[in-house]
Regions:
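Short beta-strand->loop structural element characteristic of the AMP-binding/adenylate-forming
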Residues: 93-103, 306
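Active-site phosphate-binding strand-loop segment of PLP-dependent enzymes
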Residues: 102-181, 186-189, 193, 290
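Hydrophobic packing within well-folded, soluble alpha/beta domains
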Residues: 39, 57, 61, 65, ...
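N-terminal "arm"/small-domain region of PLP-dependent enzymes with the aminotransferase-like
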Residues: 1-26, 30, 343
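Conserved coil-to-alpha-helix start sites within the AMP-binding
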Residues: 79-84
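PLP-dependent aminotransferase class I/II
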Residues: 33-37, 45-48, 109, 121-125, ...
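Phosphate-binding glycine-rich loop
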Residues: 25-72, 86-90, 96-98
Length: 366
């Protein structure tokens, strides 16, 4: 079976974890601030705050821009569900706006139209590693929180690296991401006060300079462990190479599949935008077999694929609790119904990519 994803891990990560275990300092040690500083420097941010997951990072970032009970946050319905869930954590309401059919990111015009007097923030998602049009969204007015969980290495058309613009930008390190710490995330920050607040809130509301077990604000256990930070430091050393390998694999896919009639491929880099390759997704032809049938048929051929991603507003919770219905976001619904992720990781060989593409063409009858 060709898997959907595989992390790049080796003896260096093993040695880094073993060194932490032998030190006896498994949490709140020296590796976390080192990882934060190196990661922030990599993306061009003033500060970094390491957290237990991308979801935790989104939650804290939304709190830091003032999202609270009864507020509205405009975001994309085409994302992993955590983007919307983090809004609901603060008893705010996710207000979805449709996506651009080419980039699959939040459409700035649709987002602007969704803003009301109750809108406290806009949360664009850099979907599949392609940079959202944050410069346009910044002009709409409300503060921006960037879901960059899939976008490490991405660059905006104006040359700014995703994470460097001063907005809270949240990265994630799940095993299928551009780099991994197993679980874990990091908030890139451009504001000194937000760094102080996030560092306290991830640690149960206790700032580093406070007395032991004194807490001056509501907080959470959103800490990253020393083992995760140690892995992250090694992964940062590998990152440029892993990003280059991912781009090479994506190029193979695009070259082989470019002539398949009706098959929509990821949009290429254009106008200065550079994708930080996270996954390679395609959209099944509209007159082809159902997406879920394609996934099953590919598995029968020894190839793992996944529906990627279902529309958030059509998930049971968001239908039942927030009242969303089919037909509200037609671009998202069309893309979500046809989109699948193909196997994608740095170690894929050209022969394996050819095998995947051949199987896909056979399954969709092209």
């Amino acid at each position: 079976m060709i898997p959907i994803a595989r992390p790049v891990l080796g003896a260096e990560e093993e040695a880094a974890v073993l060194a932490v275990l032998r030190s006896g300092v498994l949490s709140l040690g020296e590796r976390i601030p080192e990882f934060e500083q190196r990661f922030a420097a990599y993306v061009g941010a003033r500060h970094g705050s390491a957290v237990s997951s991308g979801t935790a990072g989104l939650h804290l970032a939304l709190r830091e821009v003032g999202v609270t009970d009864g507020d509205e946050v405009v975001t994309s319905p085409f994302s992993f569900v955590a983007s919307a869930n983090a809004i609901v954590f603060e008893r705010a309401r996710p207000v979805f706006a449709d996506i651009d059919p080419v980039t699959l990111n939040l459409d700035p015009q649709a987002a602007a139209a969704a803003v009301t007097p109750n809108t406290t923030a806009i949360l664009p998602v850099h979907i599949f590693g392609f940079p959202a049009d944050v410069p346009a969204l910044e002009k709409v007015g409300p503060p921006i929180v960037e879901d960059a969980c899939e976008a490490l290495g991405a660059v905006h058309a104006d040359g700014s690296v995703v994470g460097s613009r001063g907005n809270p930008a949240v990265f994630a390190f799940y095993p299928n991401k551009q780099m991994t710490t197993g679980e874990g995330g990091l908030i890139a920050l451009g504001d000194d006060a937000q760094k102080v607040a996030v560092d306290a809130e991830r640690n149960q509301g206790r700032a580093p300079d406070m007395d032991w077990l004194d807490h001056d604000r509501l907080g959470f256990n959103y800490r990253m462990t020393e083992m995760q930070a140690a892995i992250g430091l090694v992964q940062l050393d590998r990152l440029d190479g892993m990003l280059a390998d991912r781009a090479r694999v994506a190029g193979w896919y695009s070259e082989i599949l470019s002539g398949v009639e009706g098959l929509d491929l990821p949009c290429p880099d254009a106008d200065g935008n550079v994708r930080g390759w996270f996954v390679y997704t395609v959209q099944i032809p509209k007159d082809g077999p159902a997406r879920d049938d394609v996934v099953r048929a590919m598995r029968e051929r020894g190839i793992a694929t996944k529906p990627y991603l279902p529309a958030i507003h059509l998930m049971s919770y968001y239908r039942e609790v927030h009242g969303y219905r089919e037909g509200e976001f037609p671009v998202t619904e069309d893309v979500a119904a046809r989109s699948i992720a193909l196997p994608f990781f740095p170690q894929l060989t050209h022969g394996e990519v050819e095998q995947v593409c051949g199987a896909l063409r056979a399954v969709i009858g092209r």
